[in-house]
Amino acid sequence: MGQVLPLVTRQGDRIAIVSGLRTPFARQATAFHGIPAVDLGKMVVGELLARSEIPAEVIEQLVFGQVVQMPEAPNIAREIVLGTGMNVHTDAYSVSRACATSFQAVANVAESLMAGTIRAGIAGGADSSSVLPIGVSKKLARVLVDVNKARTMSQRLKLFSRLRLRDLMPVPPAVAEYSTGLRMGDTAEQMAKTYGITREQQDALAHRSHQRAAQAWSDGKLKEEVMTAFIPPYKQPLVEDNNIRGNSSLADYAKLRPAFDRKHGTVTAANSTPLTDGAAAVILMTESRAKELGLVPLGYLRSYAFTAIDVWQDMLFGPAWSTPLALERAGLTMSDLTLIDMHEAFAAQTLANIQLLGSERFAREVLGRAHATGEVDDSKFNVLGGSIAYGHPFAATGARMITQTLHELRRRGGGFGLVTACAAGGLGAAMVLEAE
């Protein structure tokens, strides 16, 4: 066991997570069609503050993230402060760590709490796959800049005459890694082939995710942590996530064709997480501040870790790398955990990470550790379903996982929970949570 790193303030206070909330998650171009991420962020933070009944002036910092950036609102965090009635002097800045963005936001607020610069803050993220920054070609962009500097109409017309019809076509946001040109699904296919993850195994995990998420909603387990969203023109509210297929059968998954490697692939739209719109946020404060305000925390942040690996091959192994580090810093092992919640970007990626967490060879030869991190107990793993079912608004997923895990830990009488995710760029994140 390596060095334990307690997450406490100089006064010995633990980092308390006192409340968490999210919007329902909606598939791209459905319920939240036309609503930008900044509005989703305002929606969830405003409701979170209203439900918590914490005076706005108590919140000293807001750290928020957005992966699909909109040029007109580059600092989503500050726009949320200004648009929710929070104290105008509240410090606010934005972060981005791809699919682990709200993990990063939580870590940043925790670090401010430990440094003593604040006593309470909000962390979270929002993304919209329905409101996208549609760009223009590089040639058109250059011409537009030059036209802006041209002094006469003839100069402007001459510049425009250089353009061809193809130069006027809109350019959608990139779906591939900037450094490699690989799509996430291509990497998932790599992992499936390298580690022998079959189509049947992937479909089974996806089906399990949907069934458990549907059961969680049916049992009323999510009602406290998911707000009702009222959407213009306000005819019908969105109450639940609209991606969950509770009535599907395993046979339904087998009907879909591969989405990335059309000829030999096993990754399909059904065993991958869909493009999604939504927002989520949590309130963090020092343990003593929570006591002063008479608040009972959902739980505490015990440790966190971020890692990075090469992007050319199997880059979605973030959980396999970050989990042992987070556990080490918490002074725990896999067997100490009550719950394990892993982001399901793809069923193939999830199953490959589970495989490596239990691999002695990977631990010795790749991580340089004496023993495997540990086998993942299925009875503890993604017990309420995962991202394949709920959806994945990139910057919001981490806050969803944290809130969901803490509520479930409390229902079980407390314990330790691990939340972990892969992210674009070969990044990984893991956090250990504690509930009493």
Swiss-Prot record:
GO CC, any one term: cytosol
InterPro entries in alphabetical order: Ac-CoA_C-AcTrfase_FadI, Thiolase, Thiolase-like, Thiolase_acyl_enz_int_AS, Thiolase_AS, Thiolase_C, Thiolase_CS, Thiolase_N
Gene Ontology molecular function terms on file: acetyl-CoA C-acyltransferase activity
Pathway annotation: Lipid metabolism; fatty acid beta-oxidation
Alphabetical keyword list: Acyltransferase, Cytoplasm, Fatty acid metabolism, Lipid degradation, Lipid metabolism, Transferase
Function: Catalyzes the final step of fatty acid oxidation in which acetyl-CoA is released and the CoA ester of a fatty acid two carbons shorter is formed.
Locations listed in the record: Cytoplasm
Enzyme class at the top of the EC tree: transferase
Quaternary structure annotation from Swiss-Prot or TrEMBL: Heterotetramer of two alpha chains (FadJ) and two beta chains (FadI).
Catalytic residue list: 99, 392, 422
Name this polypeptide is given: 3-ketoacyl-CoA thiolase
Pfam families the record matches: Thiolase_C, Thiolase_N
EC number(s) reported in the record: 2.3.1.16
Catalyzed reaction equations: an acyl-CoA + acetyl-CoA = a 3-oxoacyl-CoA + CoA
GO BP term, pick one: fatty acid beta-oxidation
Family, as annotated: Belongs to the thiolase-like superfamily. Thiolase family.
Claim: Cell division is one of the keywords in the record: no
